[in-house]
């Protein structure tokens, strides 16, 4: 093995390509196929555990592994390799007098990053490390491009996202984060399947009148054969509720959502959500279900109910406190809740709040809120002043949403100015949004019409009028509750990831000039 330190990347690639040719000259395909490992590194480590060297030496049979070389310590006619497969890292001991002259010539053409196969018995070295002592050794794939930073990891964060295939290899903890993400998704599936929910798939391409279910701008595309303008879905809600009308009383969908909006540490234009709907249930039922789901996921994914996010311990043990959006939002403006919803003194209160706000963007939003409905203004005040004050050490349900904020939610029987809705917050993030569903077709039609007026007034996130959805409600949708959970933010919480890009394998990035 040649030392690559101080050599340019182009020179390293040229050297490695020469080694690939040398392998071919030895009769070894540097990109061959045919080695099938029979074991994983984790199996060897678990099987022998703390056994002493004498006991390991008596164990019958060989181990057959394959993986990527992370490091090499060479001592002339012997070497120790750090090899990682999908389960763990393991030391492999290659000795000329064990593998033979031909295989050792192959070994001498090895580079860090190559993928190798090795077979032989387990042993314990003088330093006490469990090791595979190779009797058979070969290079399976020659890595012609070197890994960065000599295995100290990628230092350019954006490069990590652009070259996730390298990031997964060299950056500690990245692979584990995505394994946890996969366990979150499978855990949600098991949780809902066990409760009689049916997983379904609904369209991702929507006609313009169908592109609703959330307050967001959609991406637009065109179907050439049908000469049809289409939009990528911003939610699965309206199609899933159509299925409830059709008699599928418990349904869910895990899938991709696209929203043409800004990018920050909590938002990516393409993300994954789970939406589920249950007939003959209320938002109160879903609160209890959500508490149970969060607690179960925490135990399954992290080993206990307490997770740590950016240094803050968060206990996911139920029950979770409730915080009133109406009460907190109105009080933040110096108004009584009834006065705020009626608009009494609201414009002046918004102006005062804007004047004392240090953040210029939030100040501008507060000034503009005077043009919106009172309910929307209260919701904005809660977002700016209330959300930062939510509990830090446990999740919280935000309740008491004004009617104007929720065009698809059921009015509260005891107070029609509000809707039966909640949002779940933890670690300063909205993780879930749920409500008792509006199933009155006349009320839904009126709210769609209000959304159309808002769109005509310049609100790009207002929902379109979905006549077919109203028609579905006219056939009768049973009392229903539904919820959406952001998988990516949930993964952020359970993996202690500060940015959503850290839990999306290939996040959207600007093109490099």
UniProtKB/Swiss-Prot annotation:
Coarse class of the protein's main subcellular location: cytoplasm
Names of required cofactors: Mg(2+)
Keyword Cell inner membrane among UniProt keywords: no
Major enzyme class: ligase
Catalytic activities: tRNA(Lys) + L-lysine + ATP = L-lysyl-tRNA(Lys) + AMP + diphosphate
Organism, as annotated: Anaeromyxobacter dehalogenans (strain 2CP-C)
Sequence similarity: Belongs to the class-II aminoacyl-tRNA synthetase family.
Cofactor binding annotation: Binds 3 Mg(2+) ions per subunit.
Localisation: Cytoplasm
Cellular-component GO terms for this entry: cytosol
Protein name, as recorded: Lysine--tRNA ligase
Matches recorded under InterPro entries: Aa-tRNA-synt_II (IPR004364), aa-tRNA-synth_II (IPR006195), aa-tRNA-synth_II/BPL/LPL (IPR045864), Lys-tRNA-ligase_II (IPR002313), Lys-tRNA-ligase_II_N (IPR044136), Lys-tRNA-synth_II_C (IPR018149), NA-bd_OB-fold (IPR012340), NA-bd_OB_tRNA (IPR004365)
């Amino acid at each position: 093995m040649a030392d690559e330190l101080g050599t340019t990347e182009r020179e390293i690639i040229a050297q490695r390509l020469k080694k690939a040719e040398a392998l071919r000259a030895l009769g070894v395909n540097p990109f061959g196929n045919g080695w099938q490992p029979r074991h994983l590194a984790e199996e060897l480590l678990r099987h022998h555990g703390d056994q002493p060297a004498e006991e390991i030496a008596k164990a019958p049979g060989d181990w057959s592994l394959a993986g990527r070389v992370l490091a090499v310590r060479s001592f002339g006619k012997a070497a120790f390799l750090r090899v990682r497969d999908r389960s763990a890292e393991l030391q492999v001991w290659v000795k000329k007098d064990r593998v033979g002259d031909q295989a050792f010539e192959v070994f001498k053409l090895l580079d860090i990053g190559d993928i190798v196969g090795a077979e032989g018995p387990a042993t314990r070295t003088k330093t006490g490390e469990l090791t595979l002592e190779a009797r058979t050794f070969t290079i399976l794939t020659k890595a012609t491009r070197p890994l960065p930073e000599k295995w100290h990891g990628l230092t350019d964060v954006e490069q990590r996202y652009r070259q996730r295939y390298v990031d997964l290899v060299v950056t500690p903890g990245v692979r584990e984060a995505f394994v946890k993400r996969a366990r979150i998704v499978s855990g949600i599936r098991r949780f809902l399947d066990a409760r009689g929910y049916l997983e379904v798939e609904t369209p991702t391409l929507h006609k313009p009148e169908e592109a609703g279910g959330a307050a967001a701008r959609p991406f637009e595309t065109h179907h050439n054969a049908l000469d049809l303008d289409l939009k990528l879905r911003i939610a699965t809600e309206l199609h899933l509720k159509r299925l409830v009308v059709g008699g599928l009383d418990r349904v869910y969908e895990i899938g991709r959502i696209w929203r043409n909006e800004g990018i920050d540490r909590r938002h990516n234009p393409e993300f994954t959500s789970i939406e589920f709907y249950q007939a003959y249930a209320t938002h109160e039922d879903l609160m209890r279900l959500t508490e149970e789901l969060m607690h179960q996921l925490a135990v399954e994914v992290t080993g206990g109910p307490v997770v740590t996010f950016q240094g803050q311990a968060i206990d996911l043990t139920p029950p979770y406190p409730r915080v009133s959006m109406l009460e907190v939002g109105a009080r933040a403006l110096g108004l009584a809740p009834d006065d705020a919803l009626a608009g009494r003194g609201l414009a002046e209160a918004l102006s005062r709040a804007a004047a004392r706000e240090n953040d210029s963007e939030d100040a501008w939003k507060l000034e503009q809120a005077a043009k919106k409905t009172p309910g929307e203004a209260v919701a904005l005040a809660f977002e700016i002043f209330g959300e930062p004050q939510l509990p830090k050490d446990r999740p919280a349900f935000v309740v008491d949403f004004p009617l104007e904020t929720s065009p698809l939610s059921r009015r509260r029987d005891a107070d029609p100015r509000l809707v039966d809705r909640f949002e779940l917050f933890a670690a300063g993030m909205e993780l879930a949004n749920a409500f008792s569903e509006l199933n009155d077709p006349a009320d839904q039609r009126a709210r769609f019409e209000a959304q159309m007026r808002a769109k005509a007034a310049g609100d790009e996130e207002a929902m379109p009028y979905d006549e077919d959805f109203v028609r579905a409600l006219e056939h009768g949708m049973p009392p229903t509750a539904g919820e959406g959970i952001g998988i990516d933010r949930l993964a952020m919480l359970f993996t202690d990831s500060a940015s959503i890009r850290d839990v999306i394998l290939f996040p959207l990035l600007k093109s490099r000039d």
